Design a protein with these regions (language model features):
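A short beta-loop-alpha structural element at the N-terminal edge
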Residues: 3-15
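Conserved GNAT-fold acetyl-CoA-binding loop/helix
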Residues: 16-41
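A short helix-loop-beta-strand connector motif used in the catalytic cores of GNAT acetyltransferases and
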Residues: 41-54, 82
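Conserved beta-strand in the GNAT
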Residues: 54, 61-70, 82
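A short, internal acetyl-CoA/4′-phosphopantetheine-binding micro-motif in the GNAT/acyltransferase core
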Residues: 86-93
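Conserved active-site alpha-helix within GNAT-family acetyltransferase domains
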Residues: 99, 103, 111, 123-142, ...
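Conserved GNAT acetyl-CoA-binding A-motif
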Residues: 110-120
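Terminal substrate-recognition subdomain of acyl/acetyltransferases
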Residues: 134-135, 144-172, 176-190
Length: 190
């Protein structure tokens, strides 16, 4: 049995540990720069735009989590949910926690009138791909994910900064400060 609940500030150490565990599984053990302070601020600060949902067993032990935020479909005219991370501890896999977390996000989307729940998965992660397909999710074969990050982001973005303003920018570009963004890139249009 899986108990699903919103994350609370006391969950931050467990969430951060599972983020590190996920990075290790995804062969990027040194890529995590997140800290308890950053995670606490983004999840529980004054105006949170990123959310975490916890899965526990009947004894109250944390078995997994989902970290997600809203995206927007220009074609549908409504929000969707982007699932940034879904992680279930290895010893708890097969107990229904991952399915329960995804069902909770799907129910949240349905209840709020959102258009979809979407996420990215590494192409070599066959166990997850098969799990998602069994739930009825389908890969978006015609889409490729692009990302600007690190040096490429700095090189591309720096020339536009002149005296603290964006030159040639869209008038709404200033609204980007603090807006929710997919750290894995703009994975889907619409």
């Amino acid at each position: 049995m899986s108990v699903i609940r919103p994350a609370a500030p006391h969950d931050v150490p467990a969430i951060l540990q599972m983020i590190h565990d996920l990075a290790l599984y995804e062969k990027e053990p040194d890529a995590v720069r997140n800290t308890p302070e950053l995670l606490t601020e983004v999840l529980f600060g004054e105006n949170p735009r990123v959310f975490a949902t916890m899965a526990e067993n009947a004894s109250g032990e944390v078995r997994g989590f989902a970290l997600w935020f809203l995206n927007y479909s220009t074609w549908e005219g409504v929000h969707g949910i982007y699932l940034e991370d879904l992680y279930v501890r290895p010893e708890a896999r097969g107990e229904g926690h991952g399915k329960a977390l995804l069902q909770h996000l799907a129910a949240t989307a349905v209840d709020r009138g959102y258009a979809r729940v979407e996420w990215s998965v590494l192409d070599w992660n066959e166990p997850s791909i098969n799990f998602y397909k069994k739930l009825g999710a389908a890969p978006m074969e015609e889409w490729s994910t692009f990302r600007l990050a690190g040096a490429a982001l700095a090189a591309f973005g720096a020339p536009r900064l002149v005296s603290g303003t964006l030159t040639g920018a869209d008038p709404g570009a200033g609204a980007l400060a603090g807006s929710p963004a997919d750290s894995r890139g703009a994975a889907a249009r619409g």
